[in-house]
């Protein structure tokens, strides 16, 4: 296919145009008074959301070159979402501000490579500063504050997540389900999560989120490799008659058997998913036995004289719901408290008997997985559109609280970054020179962008608010919800340090890439042939 090649300033300007479009669409959602964005869907009702990364994923432009700019800045949002699970809008606004200022300097003749070096050095300096400013999470009240801010100032959500973390521990599993009522409820049930995702992406039932969700499935647990589909046929036939989904957890599933399962899944014959068993050797077998106890099933192993081809329906485990993504599998079970309790006691005895620290650690991990359970948040809403929006906000809030537990909290509302701007300028003036210094100053100028946008979305003058905040002490910032200047930590307006750090690093990385672009190679749009003229109608010509 023929290509279109664009050089120098024209290339950078085309990227900038795409970046402007995406940044503006996402930035309107920032802050407590941020607005919603409506996503039109080809099928089904439109979606009304407030989540930066979801909006970014939806934007595709007609112009290929501008679309490249969109894709670049979308990456800043996606990477932040992958690392911290929140802060995607902040990352987009920061990247946009850095790119705009950087392109002005490149157009004026600055060397893009040296500018990028300055941007990278400034980013490293700021990461260290954020680490120093972070305060560890002290109690569940602080967790509730993080959840509240991340869910768009919804205190009920913040409290519920703090509750859930109290019940299942800070490392515990919190899973989201669509509820049946108008109220959002919390329930703690038996269950576990392990770090293995689906073997093939074709098992995903929700292609938008790339997740496989199985309701009331059967679970086949085996410690052998499944090579031939013939081994599975008897059990698959029994399950097909029940009409229920099936999850297979095995050491591995080889190509032929996997292909057969995928084909059956795609044709709708059987709703099936397959996952590799976690762990290695004896530890793998022990974890499979834990799952068998949890799901009230049997581990099909030749050590116990059981073969796959002879497996019966009653040997399979059951669960209320299983959610699988590319990296993890979450099992939500219920009704086996006694068996799970007995199994936990057995693991505790093994811990007492072993002298190896490594074995103790691994047994402790198994115990935590089995005893911790799963907190299920059932999302309630009046309409499906509201449900989807609430679910995205809750997901952000859960990710933000986990990030806060990991790396601590910093003052929120764009305050931390705004206060770091003078410190960065001072450090850069003392340690950098020439165009590297200009690069660092580009970052310093961009640091107030999130705060300015939060203020503008609340109807205030962003530049005035930013200057006012910079002149105050470190913890003081602008509360956009009511227009006051307050101590952010005392007011409970906090962000996880990890979210602020990830957003900044990814924004600096993307800005550096855009500034050092000198040429774009893209597909030429195909010329569509004009439709042939129709024959004239009898009785004279018509104007159309």
From Swiss-Prot:
The answer to keyword Nucleotidyltransferase applying to this record is: no
Which GO molecular function terms does the record list?
ATP binding; ATP-dependent protein folding chaperone; isomerase activity; unfolded protein binding
Name a single GO biological process.
protein refolding
Spell out the GO cellular component terms annotated for this protein, sorted alphabetically and separated by semicolons.
Answer: cytoplasm
Please tell me where ATP binds in this chain: 29-32, 86-90, 413, 479-481, 495
Q: Which InterPro entries match?
A: Chaperonin_Cpn60_CS, Cpn60/GroEL, Cpn60/GroEL/TCP-1, GroEL-like_apical_dom_sf, GROEL-like_equatorial_sf, TCP-1-like_intermed_sf
Q: Which reaction does it catalyse?
A: ATP + H2O + a folded polypeptide = ADP + phosphate + an unfolded polypeptide
Q: Does the keyword Cell cycle apply?
A: no
Subunit text? Forms a cylinder of 14 subunits composed of two heptameric rings stacked back-to-back. Interacts with the co-chaperonin GroES.
Q: What does this protein do?
A: Together with its co-chaperonin GroES, plays an essential role in assisting protein folding. The GroEL-GroES system forms a nano-cage that allows encapsulation of the non-native substrate proteins and provides a physical environment optimized to promote and accelerate protein folding.
Q: What is this protein called?
A: Chaperonin GroEL 1
Give the lineage. Bacteria, Bacillati, Cyanobacteriota, Cyanophyceae, Synechococcales
